[in-house]
Amino acid sequence: MKTFTAKPETVKRDWYVVDANGKTLGRLATELASRLRGKHKAEYTPHVDTGDYIIVLNAEKVAVTGNKRTDKIYYRHTGHIGGIKQATFEEMIARSPERVIEIAVKGMLPKGPLGRAMYRKLKVYAGTEHNHAAQQPQVLDI
């Protein structure tokens, strides 16, 4: 019996919608990253993007445990000398709640072109509305 290898043109990708309301950030992000990679499928192949599209709603209501709401710090750099910026979890949720989930999931995906292709299949929205109704996403309970 020959080893099966998925081909990019034969991969079937589904659309799923996930409600992040009350979900713990890290536990949600690991499941999302696994599904974006396609590890839940029998035809998973490490060097082929076999994952599904995922829409995350209610990003502003994601939960963290302990004191992370005030103690967790996100760093970024402007590119200029002395241009390091920082924001706490609370500030990030207030400014752009989508970025919190995006950053958590992106760090769990492979680095390089394949990881960027997987990351592009993640759609995160702060509220309950999304503009992907035409794709008929199925509800995914995580």
Curated annotation (Swiss-Prot):
Would you indicate the residue range of the signal peptide?
none
Q: Name one GO biological process term.
A: translation
GTP-binding keyword on record: no
Entries under Gene3D superfamilies matching the protein = Ribosomal protein L13
Which of UniProt's keywords are assigned here?
A: Ribonucleoprotein, Ribosomal protein
Q: Which GO terms describe its molecular function?
A: mRNA binding; structural constituent of ribosome
User: Which Pfam family is one of this chain's hits?
Assistant: Ribosomal_L13
GO-annotated cellular components: cytosolic large ribosomal subunit
UniProt lists the family membership as follows: Belongs to the universal ribosomal protein uL13 family.
Task: Describe the function of this protein.
Answer: This protein is one of the early assembly proteins of the 50S ribosomal subunit, although it is not seen to bind rRNA by itself. It is important during the early stages of 50S assembly.
The record's listing under NCBIfam families reads: rplM_bact
How is this protein organized at the quaternary level?
Part of the 50S ribosomal subunit.
This chain belongs to which protein, by name?
Answer: Large ribosomal subunit protein uL13
Organism annotation: Yersinia enterocolitica serotype O:8 / biotype 1B (strain NCTC 13174 / 8081)
Q: Which gene encodes it?
A: rplM
